[in-house]
Amino acid sequence: MRSDITKSGPERAPHRALLKAMGITDDEIKRPFIGVANSANEFVPGHIHLDRIAEAVKAGIRIAGGVPFEFQTIGVCDGIAMGHGGMRYSLPSREIIEDSIEIMAQAHQLDGLVLIPTCDKIVPGHLMAAGRLDLPTIVVTGGPMLPGFACDRELDLINVFEEWQKGGESLSILEDLACPGAGSCAGLFTANSMACMAEALGLSLPGCATAHAVDAKKMRIAKLSGMMIVELVKRGLTARKIVSRESFENAVRVDMAIGGSTNTALHLPAIAAEFDIDLELDVFDRLSRETPHLVNLRPGGPHHMLDLDRAGGVQAVMHRLSSKLDLSVLTVTGKTLGAVLAEFKPVNPKANAEVIATLERPVHPEGGIAILKGSLAPEGSVVKQTAVSKKMLVHKGPAVVYDSEEESMKGILSGEVKAGDVVVIRYEGPKGGPGMRETLAPTSAIAGAGLSESVALITDGRFSGGTRGPCIGHVSPEAAVGGPIALVENGDMISIDIPNRRLDLLVDEGVLERRRASWRPPEPRVRGGVLDRYRKSVTSASKGGVLR
């Protein structure tokens, strides 16, 4: 065992003494040491319950003959960080989480890992650590929140973001009832999208992604994961032996079929890089063209994660997609994906048929995400095309330019933005932000003003997984490094053509050259601290925004 280097032989008597100080017995010292990376904290509804899940995981490890060692990682609530400077810290936390798991696993020479994340950047950070460390690893995501219910309809947090401008008694009702308890926000936003990716990659047990936070099924999956990790250690089945390029392509197809968050196009390449796999944005676009959209989940559709869980979850989606997937890839069950799917039977056949469309009769003929390129985004940009109304798939309009999210909010709320406009929010990229903030507040303000089907928004920042409408993010190169988005001026015409994957600035090249000659990079918004270090080493969003 890898951990023997810390505990075997007479020279390790001091190490054993320290282990015994924590109540570890001689018999336990001979067993596999399993790290349990628990991201529980009291800021994040999706993480408030993770101590219970960790206890179930540890019970499973003990049942199977291992010894669990729990440690913590940080976790930011993107909802609470939204709309102010705190959001700059969310994306940088991804690599800090990854680093912290590496430090604990390597310092203590753990034999295996069970990773327990739930929310937006925390799941990717854990998955990146799995690839970097290449230990036997299982991911147990914390599970979705149940949808709220008020005014005779199901609700989630995005309803509150979109309707706060109305104020009054209805806002108080939404505030009280939209988020009824523990779990990640109830639609297919970034957290749940990434949980689905963990399962689609083969790193979570079947059913894990959609098993809800308050469901006993989640506790059973956690316990079984603890038992299974000991088996993976015995078999030497590490993360890189399970996850391959084919696994990532399977995951991208699932992403397209469920209409996942645009943030998957940022996180999956970053995760792949830690597995020594180059997952280009062009792969997302190619697979999107080949993979129909099968599940119409919030924010683009009517269904919540609870509906998908009742319909059979990620396994049901992969079963539908089986003719398009590589079924030879391994999973943490120790079986191939084909063997796992051969055992799948929907518990609720009616819900399965109603929630998950067929390849022959999909919700949309193409997948959820499109990659746009052109003179405004030479390296690419990302849009959730299945959440865009048909009349806005092709649009041309004048630019209304803002150099920060705060400026854009003032402009939108004061009525500067009119139907037909293209709002441009720049200097919010990985370096420029720094931190590539999610611009949910501006998109929600546009939706709340009834303009989501007549106004487009373009940014070098990101969007929340809860964003809907013609919102194009991750524009690369970003403004802070002199990308074309830095040269846009008010009134410039911008052309959006999602079916043909184009995003163009309709300004003569000679004019752009003159603007480029006079452009100067802005002064950094931060000096010192983690954000300063981050902006100096972060790469383009088109490469996953990883650190170099």
UniProtKB/Swiss-Prot annotation:
Pfam families: ILV_EDD_C, ILVD_EDD_N. Binds 1 [2Fe-2S] cluster per subunit. This cluster acts as a Lewis acid cofactor. InterPro entries: Dihydro-acid_dehy_C (IPR042096), DihydroxyA_deHydtase (IPR004404), DiOHA_6PGluconate_deHydtase_CS (IPR020558), ILV_EDD_C (IPR056740), ILV_EDD_N (IPR000581), IlvD/EDD_N (IPR037237). Coiled coil: none annotated. The keyword Lipoprotein does not apply. One of its GO terms (cellular component) is cytosol. Pathway: Amino-acid biosynthesis; L-isoleucine biosynthesis; L-isoleucine from 2-oxobutanoate: step 3/4; Amino-acid biosynthesis; L-valine biosynthesis; L-valine from pyruvate: step 3/4. Keywords: 2Fe-2S, Amino-acid biosynthesis, Branched-chain amino acid biosynthesis, Iron, Iron-sulfur, Lyase, Magnesium, Metal-binding. Its cofactor is [2Fe-2S] cluster; Mg(2+). Mg(2+) binds at residues 78, 120-121, 438. NCBIfam families: ilvD (TIGR00110), PRK00911.1 (NF002068). Belongs to the IlvD/Edd family. This is Dihydroxy-acid dehydratase. It comes from Methanothrix thermoacetophila (strain DSM 6194 / JCM 14653 / NBRC 101360 / PT). The gene is ilvD.
